[in-house]
């Protein structure tokens, strides 16, 4: 027989004989065959393990859970955190919006794994650690899932996203320093403008990213406020006195991150503005990164029929039909990531608006999208730094050609001969395809020496 019979409040359920999950997990596995199996992010499962262990220690300290059960729950949770039980969490994102089935998946795994650790066989005899009464003691799905997702999202941001962005910032800063003396023509509206150094242009990029990281870091305090202790609707029903504050301390201890009990549990259950806020910062970074990637690939366009001011690394052949073609693939990958993050933000915004009365029921959607975005931005920034920015070179020949040919150098004459005479020189140079100097001299507005003294790109930056 390849299954065992387990019971829940709705009756008997056939559960695969060799798995640690139980009847409620199996019901969900059968009822929600939507998308890939096991799509619930494993980071959320690890967040659950941290909070379940913290709850067990808190419950014991407050006198409502015996030490043997505390230690068994803690041991199983450590196994989960270490990745030893990853295959025991088969549920999908697309389930109940409170994440109840995933909460019960974790509870059942804790219960049955503890049963085996005590020397018993799955499905035989009464379990010592009960899924609802012990693993879920002083808890509700309504306060555990938001706590698990905040732990997961916070960890992903500080462990993956911020380090990736920081690496890219440093790479761009190094290039800005390297390019600080290279004068090029600036562009506004995609048209020629006044001169700028390539280093100044790159300084704008890393400054944008620094503001984005600042926004992301500023969102973390809200994300550190956990709902655990609010139980079903925020009142804390069925929790011992002092539970909320103590469990937050244990979560901080076991996660290595400072978490605090949410000031208002009703807000913590019914709204997830912390997710909206943090992902808003990720969207800000995506918008910034999209601008940077587009600028770089346009400046690298060519190599002979485009702008060609930058030379980007030749990482791989670019065409199956055109020999020798190399494409700005890192820029393309990064802009696709940006599009995905901006799309995820739309879903999160919609999900954040679905807090009806005392509970938001879009928790799996919101948390999974943030985890995806946080990972994508962190990974993409690191890849872009290593495989594009670090290898960029300036094409000084092209840069000088465009600089010297630009009509917008005439702007330097505004304070010498006035805007209208300067415009007349520029228009004549353009219409007759001659240089600015030739046009200025032919109009008798300047001497050759005056032009050379006044129209000098080095004095315009």
What is each stretch, according to the model?
Residues 1-461:
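Conserved, well-structured ligand/cofactor-binding cores
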